[in-house]
Amino acid sequence: MASQGTKRSYEQMETGGERQNATEIRASVGRMVSGIGRFYIQMCTELKLSDYEGRLIQNSITIERMVLSAFDERRNRYLEEHPSAGKDPKKTGGPIYRRRDGKWVRELILYDKEEIRRIWRQANNGEDATAGLTHLMIWHSNLNDATYQRTRALVRTGMDPRMCSLMQGSTLPRRSGAAGAAVKGVGTMVMELIRMIKRGINDRNFWRGENGRRTRIAYERMCNILKGKFQTAAQRAMMDQVRESRNPGNAEIEDLIFLARSALILRGSVAHKSCLPACVYGLAVASGYDFEREGYSLVGIDPFRLLQNSQVFSLIRPNENPAHKSQLVWMACHSAAFEDLRVSSFIRGTRVVPRGQLSTRGVQIASNENMEAMDSNTLELRSRYWAIRTRSGGNTNQQRASAGQISVQPTFSVQRNLPFERATIMAAFTGNTEGRTSDMRTEIIRMMESARPEDVSFQGRGVFELSDEKATNPIVPSFDMNNEGSYFFGDNAEEYDN
């Protein structure tokens, strides 16, 4: 990518920093995660959680959600201006699970947001530490990506549910900043833009007045983020057209859907980061690990190392398979929901199965679920190898793929052929090549049709032994190419509903 030099690294976005060298980046990311860890330890003390209860992923998620809610200024303002029955705008809380007389019991807790903000700042040297908050948002987003399929959301915006491999980060809040934008998939950006254009079509005043000016700036910014994800000139030129449109409407929606489809073959650059639950950082800090001194990276060996010796528990419903629950959380930790299952399986060292074959529901427990029969189990989050997380979509290779998900978005920088069926994708491109973007559309279709297998395999580094922290001896795995690689293949995963 020609523009590489102007880009800040993901870690810089993550820590809100300007240009830094590798050591400074490692230190500032280390500072960020140790702040999360210190906060978690303090919250466990406040709530008087036992060691076991503090390692429960459901408790971790509740505590993470509380701090995110405490710092959600827009929602806090909204709640204060629109007081709703039974919601105290100044308080936040959620379910905390405790072990009592050999059973798990749910206790609903409430805290002042001000108090939570104080504890968070205190754990982060008095700063707001927005980067740490974004980090938690990305972990929740990665968990959603692994747990739910966004079929309904895709259909609502007029996109094809088979494009789910482009939907990384679709549940990230708008306020997640540059680090959040980096991990959003092409489909996610397209969906946000289509929603915006549809509002403009239905509401005459959407683009008008002082508010409309702000809306327009947001629209152009989102267009630029999406443009930056594309790697070919024609795709970027089409994004310029969409961005410069005087009055965005159906033509722009068509263009965006076309671009999303094209991204199944001409993949966008989407960042992947291993964001772990707060309790994992808490455990490490409590054991005396100094993240800031040692440095930390979200895209290297560090998260694998951390998970190698962290014991995290999860509540398990009566008919769920603990191994499947572990797979779900492992995928979320490494942001691997859209990775080729063969690559994930090789790295993890145990077979990673498609979503439809998992006997497990989401990690969070609804408030109306009966706690009587709940059990808890250790999550198996260790891996056999580690690999560098990628920020590019790579190029693609004509392989057979399935009716479920017709492409993957590589997470790990590992050399492989990419599974998808060219015929399936090209079938989506019949019809409309007229209009002001016709030459670009023709060019994009030509590139997709002429892509040769070697152009479109993913050139990566390979995987590494966990003892090889400097990544000196890449192991290039060989895969059975007849095997299905998609996670949401022919699937019945639950929908994500806000």
Swiss-Prot record:
Renumbered residue ranges of the record's region Disordered: 1-21
One GO MF term attached to the UniProt entry: structural molecule activity
Motif Unconventional nuclear localization signal positions after renumbering to this chain: 1-18
Motif segment (Bipartite nuclear localization signal): 198-216
Location within or outside the cell: Virion; Host nucleus
Principal subcellular localisation of the protein: virion
InterPro entries in the cross-refs: Flu_NP
BP-aspect Gene Ontology terms: symbiont entry into host cell; viral penetration into host nucleus
Subunit relationships: Homomultimerizes to form the nucleocapsid. May bind host exportin-1/XPO1. Binds to viral genomic RNA. Protein-RNA contacts are mediated by a combination of electrostatic interactions between positively charged residues and the phosphate backbone and planar interactions between aromatic side chains and bases.
Alphabetical list of HAMAP family matching this protein: INFV_NCAP
Chain's role: Encapsidates the negative strand viral RNA, protecting it from nucleases. The encapsidated genomic RNA is termed the ribonucleoprotein (RNP) and serves as template for transcription and replication. The RNP needs to be localized in the host nucleus to start an infectious cycle, but is too large to diffuse through the nuclear pore complex. NP comprises at least 2 nuclear localization signals that are responsible for the active RNP import into the nucleus through cellular importin alpha/beta pathway.
Annotated protein name in UniProt: Nucleoprotein
Organism of derivation: Influenza A virus (strain A/Chicken/Hong Kong/YU22/2002 H5N1 genotype Z)
